[in-house]
Amino acid sequence: GEVRARVKIDVEACVREAVLSLGYNDEAVGLDGRTMRVINEIIPQSPDINQGTALELNKDKEIGAGDQGIMYGFACNETPELLPLPYVLSSRMMRTFETCGDPIFAPDGKGQVSVEYNTEVCGPRRLAKVLMSNAVDYRQINGLSREAIKARAKEIAFGCLADWVDKDTVFLFNPTGEWQAVNSCSAADSGVTGRKLVVQFYGGYPGAQLGGGAVVNKSPEKVDCSAAFGARYVAKNIVAAGIAEKCAVQLSYAIGIARPFSIYINTFSTCGSATDERLAQVVEELFDLRPQGLIERFDLLNGDIYRRIPKTLFMDDYPWEKTDMADKLM
């Protein structure tokens, strides 16, 4: 990666701290943050880019977008969080596994749910399937059979999803049969940062598109980061205002230029009070979607945010989850 800074950062220490905070403290669970090898290949940012995007070089709040690209935001009224139900349920399940404290389940895992929808009312009807893949620390199983481990995982998953589970909900756990913790994480899968954007961006919900770049490895002048939050903020406030039942917001930017290259809104024929084109005009008038405006509104120079967003971009008390613009949109 590239970065330009006036401070010296102990990159290796930061990396080790982050890895250990995720529970990777033993090679038996795939990785040990204390003994792993850290290779630092961060280099200075190109001066050609830096001259148009650096905060300290642009005091007039017109810093340009750190790159060109298209970012999307989405909201719908399926849940109190104004997010698609499958995204909310799968996120809830993953958080529960992370915090349950059961030593059998190692840090490496991923979940997926399938929700059946009622096409007549365009709303969720039932939770059809739940899939949980999680590395198992076989040092901790104390003779438990594979079926007993699955039963324990099912109890955790169905417990946190109880309001949607029914007698016909199917549960799958480690469908290949076995996933040993020693063969998890970087010991088995090199991967790259931001490899599975759909996990963070609305869970593949129809109509909720993905932008071209990851969020979690970007500084805020990179609109892959800040504008993704801005687009979600706009969409959520439109739905919170009761203007539409669901809303997708597309923002595009040109590198070095502060204001959006384009603004596009799609309310999927659920807005009866205005056209999508008129909504886009109102959004451009009411929302400051320049990188500096987004950085200030969302407090994106606060380093604590970047410790949290790798786990979830939405649902928490993030500034872009506020609906404080809903009244102004009405």
Regions found by a protein language model. Give the residues of each.
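Alpha-helical support elements that line or immediately flank enzyme active sites
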Residues: 75-95, 220-242
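Glycine-rich anion/phosphate-binding loop at the beta-strand->alpha-helix junction
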Residues: 139-239
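Short, charge-patterned binding micro-sites
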Residues: 1-6, 255-259
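Glycine-rich, mobile lid/loop segments that gate access to catalytic sites or pores
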Residues: 13, 18-24, 28-182, 317-326
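Gly/Pro-rich active-site capping loops and adjacent beta-alpha segments
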Residues: 28-41, 46-51, 55-60, 67, ...
